[in-house]
Structure formats: C-alpha cells, structure tokens
UniProtKB/Swiss-Prot annotation:
Protein name: Small ribosomal subunit protein uS8c
UniProt KW Metal-binding keyword: no
Location(s), subcellular: Plastid, Chloroplast
Gene3D superfamilies: 3.30.1370.30, 3.30.1490.10
Entry function: One of the primary rRNA binding proteins, it binds directly to 16S rRNA central domain where it helps coordinate assembly of the platform of the 30S subunit.
Keywords from the UniProt entry: Chloroplast, Plastid, Ribonucleoprotein, Ribosomal protein, RNA-binding, rRNA-binding
GO biological process: translation
Family stated for the protein in its record: Belongs to the universal ribosomal protein uS8 family.
GO CC list: chloroplast; ribonucleoprotein complex; ribosome
Organism annotation: Zygnema circumcarinatum (Green alga)
C-alpha cells in the first residue's frame, strides 16, 4: 500500500466502487478512521469496522449502492493534496461542488472535517479530497 495512506484509501474505495465490491480494506490510522467516519455520516458508505490481522489493524469499509441499479453512492472521489504537491485553503476559499451536493474533506488544526464545519469554525487547512 505504500506510505500514502490517504491516497491508498481513496484508490481502494474508487476501485471497489468500479468493481462493485461489497467491502474494501484499508490500513487503520487516525486519519483514515476520521475520513471513513465523515463518509459514513454523510451516507456515502454503509458501514465501517476495524479488524486486526496479527499486528496489523485494517478498516473494513462496506460500500453503499443504490438498490435497483447497483450504482455506487460515491460517484466521484478525487484525491487533491498529494505528498508531492500539498494544497491548502483558508476558510473563505474552500471550494464547493454542485451547489453543496458534494463534500470537501480537509485536515485542519482542529482535526479532519468537512468544508461546512471548517467554514462555520472559520478554519482553513489542507484540502484532502472531494467526494460527490
């Protein structure tokens, strides 16, 4: 998986959606837990649980699909701030998508949060990913 756990998580979710997988497993870190909890709160994924294999902890993310068409709830998930090029934004310049239909996940001094919370608390930070 490499050292870029956020990138690995986003890629696993994207590939799982494309292959219509029921679950995907990503390394359990504080950041991946926070991102998974935000996706769960917003209804983009069905469930998150933690599993341990010997000394390695993994998050098991249950993906969510529409019942009849089996289309994934996450249409697009895009990784923005990469290890080679960090992207930062203050609270006034945080992007919004499709008239608040999607979410922006940021890493701020107050933790990992969505764009709405960051604007309300007037904190900026590193733009991690877009989800819609």
């Amino acid at each position: 998986m490499g050292n870029d756990t956020i990138g690995s998580m986003i890629t696993c979710i994207r590939n799982g959606n494309l292959s219509k997988a029921k679950t995907v497993e990503v390394p359990a870190t504080q950041i991946t837990r926070s991102i998974a909890n935000i996706l769960l709160q917003e209804g983009y994924i069905a469930n998150v649980r933690e599993r341990q294999y010997n000394a390695i902890r993994m998050l098991v993310i249950t993906l969510k699909y529409q019942t009849k068409t089996r289309k994934p709830h996450i249409t697009i998930i895009k990784y923005i701030s990469k290890p080679g090029l960090r992207v930062y934004s203050n609270h006034q310049d945080i992007p919004q998508f499709l008239g608040e239909m999607g979410i922006v996940i940021l890493s701020t001094s107050k933790g990992i949060m969505m764009h709405r919370e960051a604007r309300a608390q007037k904190v900026g930070g590193e733009v991690l990913c877009y989800v819609w």
